[in-house]
Amino acid sequence: MSGDSSGRRPEGRGRGRDPHRDRTRSRSRSRSPLSPGSRRGAAPERREAPERPGLEDTEPSDSGDEMIDPASLEEETDPSLCRQIRHQYRALINSVQQNREDILNASDKLTEVLEEANTLFNGVSRAREAVLDAHFLVLASDLGKEKAKQLRSDLNSFDMLRYVETLLTHMGVNPLEAEELIRDEDSSDLEFIVYDSWKISGKTAENTFNKTHTFHFLLGSIQGECPVPKPRIERPRKVRMIEEQQAMPAQLKRMEESHQEATEKEVERILGLLQTYFQEDPDTPMSFFDFVVDPHSFPRTVENIFHVSFIIRDGFARIRLDRDRLPVIEPVNINEESGGNTQIRNQAIIALSYRDWEEIVRTFEISEPVITSSQSQQRLSA
C-alpha cells in the first residue's frame, strides 16, 4: 500500500496547479531580478547590491520565459487563503497522529489521507505551507514503513517438517509405518522400503537434470589388453658414430701436443737470439720494443710478446727501465739467477692495440725485426 500511496501523490500535485498562479509566474518572469521594478518597496541600497541567484532562478521554466520572482508571487497570494490552507494542514497532521493505529490496521486509510494532502497541496504557494506539507510527508512515510513491516513474506523461510511429510507422501511411505519400522531394529523391511522409496524419488528428480555423456574408451572395452610395444632395433650406423667420437679426442690431443712443442722450440730460439746479441755487445742494453716489435706484422708482434713472457716467467731474462724510463730487456746469468731468488718479482699485463703498434714503429723508427720467423713457424702458419 505504501507503493500505491507514493505513486498517487506526485500525480495529484502535477495536475492540481492553479492556472491563476501560473499566469502570475509567467508575468513575473519577464522582469529582471536586478531591476528596480522587480521588488516593490525594496530599499535603494538593497537594489544596488548584487544578488546571488537562488534555486528557483536557475531552474528553467516550461514556457521558456525568464525566472520567477518569489517576492512578487507572495504579495499576489491571498493571505486568508494561505491561512486556511495552514489550518487544514495542521488539522490533517493532528488527525494522522491521533489515529495512527487505525491507519495501520485499515487497508485504504493511508491512501485517503494522501489524496486529501494532494488536494491541499494544489493551493500551496509559500514556504510556510510547504513546511507543513513536508511535515505531513514525514509522518506518511513512517506509516508506510510500518505497514510494510506488517506484510508477511515466506520467501526466506523453510519448514523442514512440512518438506519431509510431502516427500514421504510422494514416495508412497506412510509416516506411521515408517516410525514402527525404525523402532523395530530387527525388521528387514526397512531397507527395502527405503531403497524403493528413494528409487521413486530419483526417477522424479532425473527429469530436471541434463543427461551426461558416458565414457568411451579408445582401446575398446576395459578388459582389452594393451598392445605390446615393439623392441627397438639398433642400427650399425650408431656404432660407427661412437667409434668416430672415440677417435676425435686422440686426434685433438696430438694436435695440442704439436703446438706445445712448437711453442717451446720458439721460446728457446728467441732466448738464444737475446743471449747472442748480448755476447756481441754486452754494454749496450736492448730496447724491449726493438726486440719484440715486428714492423711488418702486428700479429707477429703479439706472438713475440707472448713468447718473451715465458722467458721472463722462467727467470732467464728480466725487464727494467733505463734513464729515459723506457723498458729494456737483458738476459740473466746463472750466478745472478741463483742470487736473485730472494728478490720480489712483479707481474704486469701489456695492452697493445693496432694504433699503439703503429705509433711505436713510427716513434722508435723500427725498420727490420730482430726476431725473424723460423721455417717451422712459417710451416705451421701456412
Curated annotation (Swiss-Prot):
GO cellular component: chromosome, telomeric region; nuclear body; nucleus; Smc5-Smc6 complex
Keyword Phosphoprotein among record annotations: yes
Annotated localization: Nucleus; Chromosome, Telomere
Bias (Low complexity) ranges: 31-41
Disulfide bonds: none
InterPro entries xrefs: Nse4/EID, Nse4_C, Nse4_Nse3-bd
Annotated Acidic residues bias: 56-78
Region (Disordered): 1-80
Alphabetical GO biological process terms: DNA damage response; DNA recombination; DNA repair
Compositional bias segments (type: Basic and acidic residues): 1-21, 42-55
Keyword annotations from UniProtKB, A to Z: Chromosome, DNA damage, DNA recombination, DNA repair, Nucleus, Phosphoprotein, Telomere
Keyword Phosphoprotein listed: yes
Entry-annotated residues carrying Phosphoserine: 374
Positions carrying Phosphothreonine: 342
Subunit annotation: Component of the SMC5-SMC6 complex which consists at least of SMC5, SMC6, NSMCE2, NSMCE1, NSMCE4A or EID3 and NSMCE3. NSMCE1, NSMCE4A or EID3 and NSMCE3 probably form a subcomplex that bridges the head domains of the SMC5:SMC6 heterodimer. Interacts with NSMCE3.
Role: Component of the SMC5-SMC6 complex, a complex involved in repair of DNA double-strand breaks by homologous recombination. The complex may promote sister chromatid homologous recombination by recruiting the SMC1-SMC3 cohesin complex to double-strand breaks. The complex is required for telomere maintenance via recombination and mediates sumoylation of shelterin complex (telosome) components.
Entry's family note: Belongs to the NSE4 family.
Record-given protein name: Non-structural maintenance of chromosomes element 4 homolog A
Lineage, uppermost ranks: Eukaryota, Metazoa, Chordata, Craniata, Vertebrata
